[in-house]
């Protein structure tokens, strides 16, 4: 009997929570219907990892890192993160892909501000262990790719000056994560933002990210 219990524990499914914004939710550049599960990058990640893993999607359009949104409301990632972690425990890994919505005019924050904000999310995750529900998960931060040309985008009016800031984020966030012992992968190394709206991704980019993140996950777990 003890042998079979040990075998079951050895084959335990690994649970992964993907916490992000509209690009995790599956918002298409043409503002059409949401991408299906198989197209969205967490779904691609699930397919790449296989049956030994369970990938949970928590993407919310408009979600930012730590800010109360005075226009849309309900988009503060820090307020939502720990309740979501607890609701999905036990968790082995949390993947955070946020920062793009922080570039909105209404927040007026810099790439360094965003890096510190992501640091707060990581700290909250690392402190989320519960005596009954489970231990705190490992954390992987994904830096969002730079925005594309916004001149003809429906989002141009709320992202004034965001293109240049978004191009700076990978280096600033990378330095911050290295200094604070946080795992980070630059999604911009494999993903190109669509020229259609300058913010969201075509299906092929979701596929590229899912494949790349699978390699990161396997190295961690």
PLM feature spans:
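Alpha-helical cap/lid subdomain in secreted, periplasmic
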Residues: 12, 74-221
């Amino acid at each position: 009997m003890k042998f079979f219990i040990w075998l079951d524990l050895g084959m335990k499914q690994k649970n992964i929570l993907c916490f992000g914004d509209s690009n995790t939710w599956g918002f298409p550049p043409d503002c059409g219907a949401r991408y299906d599960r198989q197209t969205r990058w967490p779904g691609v990640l699930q397919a790449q990892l296989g049956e030994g893993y369970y990938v949970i999607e928590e993407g919310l359009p408009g979600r930012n890192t730590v800010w109360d949104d005075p226009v849309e409301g309900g988009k503060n990632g820090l307020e939502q993160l720990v309740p979501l972690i607890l609701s999905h425990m036990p968790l082995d890994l949390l993947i955070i892909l946020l920062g793009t919505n922080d570039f909105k005019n209404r927040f007026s924050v810099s790439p360094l501000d965003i890096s510190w904000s992501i640091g707060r999310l990581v700290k909250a995750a690392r402190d989320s262990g519960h005596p009954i529900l489970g231990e705190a998960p490992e954390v992987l931060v994904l830096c969002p790719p730079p925005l594309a040309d916004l001149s003809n985008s429906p989002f141009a009016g709320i992202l004034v000056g965001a293109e240049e800031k978004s191009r700076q984020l990978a280096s600033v966030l990378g330095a911050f994560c290295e200094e604070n012992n946080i795992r980070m992968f630059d999604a911009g190394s494999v993903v190109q933002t669509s020229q259609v709206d300058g913010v969201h991704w075509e299906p092929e980019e979701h596929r590229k990210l899912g494949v790349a993140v699978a390699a990161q996950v396997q190295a961690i777990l």
